[in-house]
A protein has these predicted regions:
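A short, conserved alpha-helical patch in the ABC ATPase nucleotide-binding domain
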Residues: 69, 73-74
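ATP-binding Walker
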Residues: 12-13
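Conserved coupling/switch loops of ABC nucleotide-binding domains, chiefly the family-specific signature
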Residues: 28-31, 184
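C-terminal boundary and immediately downstream tail of ABC-type ATPase nucleotide-binding domains
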Residues: 198-220
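P-loop (Walker A) phosphate-binding loop of NTP-binding proteins
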Residues: 9
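ABC-family ATPase nucleotide-binding domain "signature/switch" substructure
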Residues: 16, 22-24, 48-57, 65-68, ...
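Conserved ABC transporter NBD signature motif
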Residues: 30-37, 47
Length: 220
């Protein structure tokens, strides 16, 4: 798992990197390769088959929850749809709805909360089962309890997939195989959590500041 990390208070280019990797935009210089092939030379359909992209702001169609999740893989059975929902931590809240998986979510998912919409989008990505998953602040609207559940599900996927995560929360990045620290749209540090702490750079400064902030809050 590789995580692009930056302070959420500033525009450091994390989401731009995610969209470039996903093939949403073309690079103006340099190159992005997938399996040794230039991304810009690959058919969009092939890129779409290889990559699942989950952003902070995911669109749901005015259809049932089941149909929205199944868009990840139209041939999926009901059991597979529900398994993906369990993995993403949304099965419990879905079953509490009057119509369960057949609940219509409303225009752009307006009948659901932001966190619920996000978990359904993650379930859709899990069902798609693409070899590359990009999570662009994908847990930002999820409450702490469900975020922990999502994190466990994401970790379970890493044994046979490439996970690229955009994040600014420390608990999200600590266990990553590689953390890339961005500042003003440039990668300035690279390594594991422990390696970056030893470097005493921007990442270590941020960790220290967060720990001090938590200590201050607890002392109030």
């Amino acid at each position: 798992m590789t995580i692009f990390f930056g302070n959420y208070l500033t525009q450091w280019g994390k989401s731009t990197v995610a969209k470039l990797i996903a093939g949403y935009w073309d690079v103006t210089s340099g190159s992005i390769t997938l399996g040794g092939h230039e991304l810009k030379d690959m058919p969009l359909s092939e890129i779409a088959d290889q990559i699942s992209y989950v952003s902070q702001d995911n669109y749901l169609f005015n259809r049932s929850i089941r149909e929205n999740i199944r868009m990840g893989r139209p041939s999926a059975t009901d059991a597979e749809v529900e398994q993906a929902a369990k993995q993403s931590g949304c099965d419990a809240f879905i079953r509490k709805l009057n119509n369960g998986y057949d609940t219509v979510v409303g225009s752009a998912g307006s009948h659901l909360s932001g966190g619920e919409r996000q978990r359904i989008a993650i379930a859709r990505a899990m069902l798609k089962d693409a070899p590359i998953i990009i999570l662009d602040e994908a847990t930002s609207s999820v409450d702490p309890e469900n975020e922990d559940e999502l994190q466990r599900a994401i970790e379970a996927l890493t044994h046979d997939k490439t996970i690229i995560m955009i994040a600014h929360q420390l608990k999200t990045v600590r266990n990553a195989d590689q953390i890339l620290v961005l500042d003003n749209a440039h990668i300035i540090q690279r390594g594991t959590h422990a390696e970056l702490i030893r470097q005493n750079g921007l990442y270590a400064d941020f960790v220290s500041a967060r720990q001090e902030a938590i200590g201050w809050k607890l002392a109030q």
